[in-house]
Amino acid sequence: MATKLIKHGSKAREQMLEGIDILADAVKVTLGPKGRNVLIEQSFGSPKITKDGVTVAKSIELKDKIRNAGAQLLKSAATKAAEVAGDGTTTATVLARALAREGNKLVAAGYNPMDLKRGMDLAVNAVVEEIKKSSKKINSQEEIAQVGTISSNGDKEIGEKIAKAMEEVGKEGVITVEEAKNFSFDVEVVKGMMFDRGYLSPYFVTNSEKMVAELENPFILLFEKKLSNLQPMLPILEAVVQSQRPLLIIAEDVEGEALATLVVNRLRGGLKVAAVKAPGFGDRRKAMMEDIAILTKGELITEDLGMKLENVSIKSLGTAKRVTISKENTVIVDGNGDKKNIEDRVLQIKSQIAETTSDYDKEKLQERLAKLSGGVAVLKVGGATEVEVKERKDRVEDALAATRAAVE
């Protein structure tokens, strides 16, 4: 069993404060729009340049156990600020250090620590109320850009790109940040629903130059289980062939004989078809397939409700204006779902977001909400070197989190 180092009283507090000071001094230089960058050595690859307080805090581990305990205590304040607001981590660190320092002085002077804690709670509540009174709603695109600019260390381009992305997909839309393969910084907007599953066979590709399968005005079959035999599907396949429209199959998986038969039909030109795996896992996969069904005005074929493939009619299939499938992603554009049904589904997901206590579940529900209600915007961050790209990407992520918090 590992031995424990036990210390009491003022000496222990002083050593913990030394650890708090070491971490706070490293973090505080990044404070505000005029804050400076910090260079962090990494165990592999190039050094990391960042102006993000929590990134600096997370990189610090002290050899002395008591000092390190103080540093970790302060680190938890920065981490919590990052989780809740996504930004303001340096401010949280500086304030937490001040509370610890001044609190220690009063404890040393004989004040009751619990009375001090109660006083701090009262002060926090009073300050929060005053901040709420002086706050203002962020509505216009110009104001959104200003928040992003300030949070990104005065980079106007970052602020403007975030504002543009929010305008395109809405304040609740999915906005992701990726590294670009060139020098530019662009906003790429995908209208409709995108999920991270690509075609199950490259033989489904219709555009060999772009290596994508493009289906115009397709029917969409949603099946909850695996497809390994197409025999039960023959009636619906014949109906689709007669309609002379393409077919997209979304199922848990399409394998073996079923996949081979679809590929052969595709190559012979008898049926314009593509198959993809359903997004997500378990209950979340079923919920996402139900989302797609509502978006495309189709039905999720599930055996739990006694539905069988051989009994499916063409009326049970969803439809969309266009579907584009790459090796990694599927995009359903302009689904023909009923607007009222989509709005009801959006309200249902919002209700689930309000009720859940899990951060992970909340994030996944918000992704589903955005896919249904808006679209997907990708901020592609480029630069001359890997270090520059990563530093700018960090600032974009910080600015995006701050802007999201501002428009809530």
Swiss-Prot record:
It is an enzyme of class 5 (isomerase). Forms a cylinder of 14 subunits composed of two heptameric rings stacked back-to-back. Interacts with the co-chaperonin GroES. One of its GO terms (molecular function) is isomerase activity. The keyword Transmembrane helix does not apply. ATP binds at T30, L31, G32, P33, K51, D87, G88, T89, T90, T91. It catalyses: ATP + H2O + a folded polypeptide = ADP + phosphate + an unfolded polypeptide. SUPFAM superfamilies: GroEL apical domain-like, GroEL equatorial domain-like. This is Chaperonin GroEL. GO terms for biological process: protein refolding. Belongs to the chaperonin (HSP60) family. It holds the Pfam family Cpn60_TCP1.
